[in-house]
Amino acid sequence: MPGLVPPPDHSKSLFVLAIGITVVSALFVLKSHTFPIAGDNIHRFPSGGQYKDGTKQINYCPPTHARYPKYPDYKWLAATAAIVIPLCLYISYHPGNNIRRICPCCNTYHHP
């Protein structure tokens, strides 16, 4: 059967294609700037900052406590939830409690 030949090996070309897609994706992510740029028609503050001269004073992106005084800080709520939820799960599934549960496989009661 001289007409049968093995299929060509595309692993090297696919490897080069994967490297190219990775490089292009990395460059796209590093070069894209999606945040709004603060400033006016003369001064640009992409990361915040301040400008002051004789007649003009601009202050963009001050510290968060001065910028958003009316919004409360919910870090304590997240920390409390991170402690309380696992504690409740531990208490409810602890082998020491005498709650009998129905087994979803055999539909009978088993002691934990």
UniProtKB/Swiss-Prot annotation:
This is Uncharacterized 12.4 kDa protein. It comes from Cymbidium mosaic virus (strain Singapore). It comes from the Viruses. InterPro entries: Plant_vir_prot (IPR001896).
